[in-house]
Amino acid sequence: MTDDPAATPRPETSVNARPAFSGQAPIKAEYLINTTPIVESASASELNNIHPDDAAEGRTDSRDSRDGRDRPDNKRRKPNKQDKKDKKGQNKGRHFPVIREASVRICRAWETTGICDRADKGDCRYAHSWEGYFEVKPNDISYRPDWSLVGEAPFVVEGERVVGGEDVVGKTLDLDTVCPVLKDLGYCPFGWRCRFLGAHVKRVAAAVDGEKEKEAGPEKRMGEWQVENWVQSEVENGWKQKETNWPEHEVLNALRRSTASFPFSEAYLKKVDPDKPFTLQNKKPTKQQPHKRKNNVLDEEEAANGPTGIPSAGDDEENAMNATENERNEEKGKVYGEPEAIDVPLRPEEKRRLNWEGGRYLAPLTTVGNLPFRRLCVDYGATITVSEMALAQPLVYGAKEEWALVRRHESEKMFGVQVAGGFPNRMVPAAEVIANTIGKGGGVDFVDVNMGCPIDLVFNQGAGSALMDSPGRLGKLLVGMNRALGDIPLTVKFRTGVAHGKPNAHKLIPRFVTEWGAGALTIHGRSRQQRYSKPADWEYIKTCVTALRESVADANLPPVPIFGNGDCFSAASYYEEMDRSGVDGVMVARGALIKPWIFTEIKERREWDISAVERLEGIKKFAEFGLSHWGSDTQGVNTTRRFLCEALSFQHRYIPIGLLERLPAKLNERPPAYRGRNELETLLASPFAGDWVKISEMFLGKVDEGFSFVPKHKSNAYGGEEAQG
């Protein structure tokens, strides 16, 4: 590499100019690309035909608009510390606007029932007719699941679009398309708004003026077209659209208005903190504040214990709850000692047993661990899944965006809800409302407490890994949740400790089981301070396993499963880590994000040299699952596209094992510039967001105007100027 910017391309726009560094993946020489600058455009397509001999001819314009050459003084400024920092890390404060049809906004009440009470009063601002809607509605997305996928461009061998006709409705239709929602559910609740409408309409004789009377219900006929299989799904026995955990509207309204009752939480918190009044008052109950997770779609670094406009735990509460056990009055802080007290933990036989030995456990993953992704992992062989991290305070305040995170698909046979929070006066009510709503219908098999989140905004509020340094507060929190959940097991996920070199997990583990009643444990083999920068410490995990086994035996308790977590990236490493540490299983996190098929490898105890076409099949499944979950209208398609790009922002880091000189691959190794064994494999390895959008277009149609995508981790964004920021 040279210091001359004319010869060294910008790292964020050149795949083939990455310098060699420790931790570089050993790729076979025939797949390597010469590090001499050759590619400046943000696309992987130019890499397919590049050979080392082309290096001298490949560069057409070496000027960098940011190298300072165009300034009057023609002086080049050396990059400072901030410049270097800006080129790496995370894109924070990402914003994803909601993209709907650029057309007449149809009243949802009228659309689904044919009636709008507000329209009769003249105060509904939405349209109550489909007139004008199809004049601007985008054409159907052409999609058939039986289309062939191939390794060379165009990658998807599509059929011809079959247009419905020249009329205003027919010209938007593709009569040969397949609606993924209809395919999955047997009906489509999106009716005329479906972007795959041609799959569920039929041509009927045009009605003569005055011949057709208005039928009750939604309008199912437009000119010579009639929509079929349009069903407005309702919650039946807790299930809707093959998903469960739909709290009743009355329950959410009561939570928002602070009229819901928490009898157990009130009694328990009065017991452990008699001087502190129990209150869950939402200061703005009449107008629910927009949830930050909705507006900015929070990633881990933006999650806090309270949404915008809703008060979080105050300084007085934090000071009181953070007080050490020695500072507490013994009678006030004592949790155990009275057999009849409400805060005595349930006996082990009163809780459901978690028989997890050998289970294939997918970690809770904020943003990317959504329901369609979990469904994909289950399809590959995962047997234990957990929701994205839900924040206790928004759950207690009835934020619908937070409750959407706990949704469960019918394919998830062992499913838990992970809750984060720092204080008993939020976590115990959250456990109580979970038990009384989704817990009664079998919607949750266990509740997991997040004690591992390392990010500052969570840690500084006493939640996540901060709980490990506050055992007094932690004990009250866990015991209260355990009692509130009834027979639903409570599990904990934690790190080795807060500070590097000062682990304390082994001291807490005996108390987790014998005092606080945890039904299963998961330990991430890094401290909060380490984040993900160092390899997981499996020797320390072994120490923790020994501490658990001894404490369980001494207390004469039934076996309690313990899982390890950290750096699992292959079947070989999975079983090696299990044998070395003695854990009952290994929770897979980043490894599943990069290669969701790792669960197939673990199940079959093999290393899978998965082909590019097989990987594309998995991407197609994710798109189908996403449309079933988020919807097949324009808004649902764009939401699916956004989360598909999120998934590809991790999956592009996978290096095919057929290209490696040694196995198994290591999670933290990064590849030098390389090309795949075919065009598709090269495309799937692209770090450019524009290429991820191109991949999404294979199954979700052309991107809509206004769509932009900013990767969670810095890379080339796709979209307008705001996206580039």
Swiss-Prot record:
* Record protein name field: tRNA-dihydrouridine(47) synthase [NAD(P)(+)]
Recite the UniProt keywords alphabetically. Cytoplasm, Flavoprotein, FMN, Metal-binding, mRNA processing, NAD, NADP, Nucleus, Oxidoreductase, Repeat, tRNA processing, Zinc, Zinc-finger
Ranges annotated as biased composition (Basic residues):
284-295
- Does the keyword field hold NADP? yes
**Function statement:** Catalyzes the synthesis of dihydrouridine, a modified base found in the D-loop of most tRNAs. Specifically modifies U47 in cytoplasmic tRNAs. Catalyzes the synthesis of dihydrouridine in some mRNAs, thereby affecting their translation.
Requisite cofactors: FMN
PANTHER family per UniProt: TRNA-DIHYDROURIDINE(47) SYNTHASE [NAD(P)(+)]-LIKE
Q: Where in the cell is it found?
A: Cytoplasm; Nucleus
Task: Write out the ranges of the annotated region (Disordered).
Answer: 1-26, 43-95, 275-339
What is the phylogenetic placement of the source species in the record? Eukaryota, Fungi, Dikarya, Basidiomycota, Agaricomycotina
> Which residues lie in Basic and acidic residues bias regions?
51-73, 80-89, 325-337
Q: Give the UniProt family note.
A: Belongs to the Dus family. Dus3 subfamily.
Q: Which residues bind FMN?
A: P364, L365, T366, Q418, K493, H524, N565, G566, D567, A589, R590
Q: Where are the zinc fingers (C3H1-type)?
A: 101-131, 178-203
Question: Domain of life here?
Answer: Eukaryota
Gene Ontology annotations of biological process type: mRNA processing
Listed CDD domains: DUS_like_FMN
Q: Which organism is it from?
A: Cryptococcus neoformans var. neoformans serotype D (strain JEC21 / ATCC MYA-565)
- GO molecular function list: flavin adenine dinucleotide binding; mRNA dihydrouridine synthase activity; tRNA dihydrouridine synthase activity; tRNA-dihydrouridine47 synthase activity; zinc ion binding
| Reactions accelerated catalytically | 5,6-dihydrouridine(47) in tRNA + NAD(+) = uridine(47) in tRNA + NADH + H(+); 5,6-dihydrouridine(47) in tRNA + NADP(+) = uridine(47) in tRNA + NADPH + H(+); a 5,6-dihydrouridine in mRNA + NAD(+) = a uridine in mRNA + NADH + H(+); a 5,6-dihydrouridine in mRNA + NADP(+) = a uridine in mRNA + NADPH + H(+)
